[in-house]
A protein has these predicted regions:
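Short regulatory helix/loop adjacent to the ATP-binding pocket of P-loop NTPases
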Residues: 105-106, 123-136, 149-153
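Structural recognition of the conserved hydrophobic beta-strand(s) that form the central parallel beta-sheet
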Residues: 90-92, 113-122, 138
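Short glycine-rich substrate-engagement loop in P-loop NTPases that contacts/grips substrate
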Residues: 53-84
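Hydrophobic positions on the alpha1 helix immediately C-terminal to the Walker A/P-loop
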Residues: 34, 38
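Interdomain hinge/linker elements that couple catalytic modules in large macromolecular machines
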Residues: 149-270
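Conserved lysine of the Walker
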Residues: 31
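Pre-Walker A adenine-sensing motif
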Residues: 2-16
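Conserved P-loop NTPase "ATPase switch" module shared by AAA+ and STAND
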Residues: 80-99
Length: 270
């Protein structure tokens, strides 16, 4: 699937002043898939690390303080050569900020010849890092324009943009709305978009929704240093009921009887 992030990644690769790139966003929006596809297309080889519970990787990055030693040990850990300008190093599922912190050393060189991308679903804790040390790029779910490209309807995009630019009626408005309804059914999830294109049975999307929901719940379970896990899960489970109401104000009583704002404020803000 063609994603807008691809344009950014190609520009990043060719930027002589590039830094280590941190791509962040919700789980299941296509971060890893897009980065690996980019790597396969643009580099001689891709060296991939899954940082989730990877103690050896974490210890290496905490211990080594120079670019050369970090690269050498990453090469040893992966049993692959890391070539300047020809290898893409991908560190996925970065949940430990010490990994990101270790990458700041690469930002001290004028021209970075090692191409490194970190992928994380963390957002809030990234604010402490400076842009001169690292590059950050948010990646969101599939938007409506990307969806229309995926279903091979670029012409409709042109009609919409022209009508918007000229402030004129869109000649295929009802057609666009039908496609928009189909898009909303996917939730902007790449896997759901692919399934909706290749299978007319919309009920199969429920399996993807359930899988993604379970993934989010699992992630909430790892955030014990940031929020109360039990209350975080209660807030998450109440979202469908909150959205069904005519009144758009968040109602704490829908979480459970007797709920108060001060008990859930931290979880809701997160």
């Amino acid at each position: 699937m063609e994603r807008k992030i691809n344009v950014y990644l190609n520009r990043w690769k060719r930027d002589v002043s590039k830094k280590v790139l941190v791509i962040y966003g919700n789980k299941q929006v296509g971060k890893t898939y897009s980065v690996l596809k980019f790597g396969e297309k643009e580099y001689k080889n891709v060296v991939y690390f899954n940082a989730d519970n990877n103690i050896e990787l974490l210890n290496t990055l905490k211990r080594e303080k120079t670019m050369e030693k970090i690269i050498m040990h990453l090469s040893l850990l992966s049993n692959e050569s890391i070539l300047t300008n020809d290898t893409l190093v991908v560190i996925d599922n970065v949940n430990d900020l010490e990994i990101i912190n270790a990458m700041k050393i690469f930002g001290k060189t004028q021209e970075l010849n090692y191409h490194i991308i970190l992928i994380t679903s963390l957002r809030e804790n990234l604010k402490k890092f400076k842009c001169e040390e690292l590059q950050f790029k948010a990646m969101n779910s599939v938007d409506f324009e990307e969806y229309l490209v995926a279903i091979n309807n670029k012409q409709l995009i042109d009609f919409i943009k022209t009508s918007f630019k000229n402030n004129t009626p869109m000649p295929f408005h009802s057609v666009a709305m039908d496609y928009y309804d189909d898009y909303l059914m996917t939730g902007g999830l790449p896997e759901a978009v692919e399934m909706s294109i290749n299978n007319s049975n919309k009920y199969l999307l429920n399996t993807i929704y359930s899988k993604v929901s379970d993934t989010y719940k699992k992630e909430i379970g790892t955030l014990d240093t940031l929020i109360d896990i039990t209350r975080g899960l209660e807030v998450y489970d109440s979202i469908p009921y909150q959205l069904q109401k005519q009144n758009r104000k968040f109602q704490y009583g829908l979480i459970k009887a007797g709920s108060r704002s001060k008990d859930y404020e931290k979880s809701i803000n997160f």
